[in-house]
């Protein structure tokens, strides 16, 4: 059995409290000037499957999340960034105040950024960017995508 359902069902007040904690923690950091808000959510998906030959089954999947988006301003330059935590189980979420403080840290790190000169440089991707790149690559090398011609590898079929 998959362990993808958390019976914990937070109410609106506890979600509002979690969102407020994330936002307050971010706003408490020097240099953070504004907030686009803290957010907290919970969801449950019920999946039911039935076939014409008599098979039927179902399962539930839950999700919990908390995030904060904040703004910093220095010398007329404004930057915005965020942090979030999501988990199947509420107890696995990062603390709301840690999410808020990390959102503030990420936002402040963007202040004073400048473009690098042209050249060859080693690249380190942020975990959020890396996950997106891996997902895009996985979709491109999927056999069905290649066969449908929707992959950038479509013209490479049969080549080494």
Feature annotation, model-predicted:
Residues 1-160:
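Active-site bordering "gate/hinge" segments
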């Amino acid at each position: 059995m998959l362990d993808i359902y958390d019976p914990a069902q937070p109410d609106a007040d506890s979600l509002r409290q979690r969102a407020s904690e994330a936002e307050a923690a971010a706003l408490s950091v020097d240099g953070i000037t504004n907030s686009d808000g803290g957010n907290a959510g919970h969801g449950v998906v019920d999946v039911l499957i039935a076939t014409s030959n008599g098979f039927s089954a179902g399962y539930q999947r839950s999700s919990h999340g908390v995030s904060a988006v904040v703004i910093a301003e220095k010398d007329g330059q404004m930057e915005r960034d965020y942090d979030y935590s999501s988990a199947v189980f509420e107890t696995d979420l990062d603390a709301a105040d840690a999410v808020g403080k990390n959102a503030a840290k990420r936002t402040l790190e963007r202040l004073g950024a400048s473009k690098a000169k042209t050249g060859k440089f080693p690249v380190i991707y942020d975990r959020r960017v890396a996950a997106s790149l891996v997902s895009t690559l996985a979709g491109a090398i999927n056999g069905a995508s290649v066969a449908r011609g929707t992959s950038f590898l479509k013209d490479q079929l049969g080549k080494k």
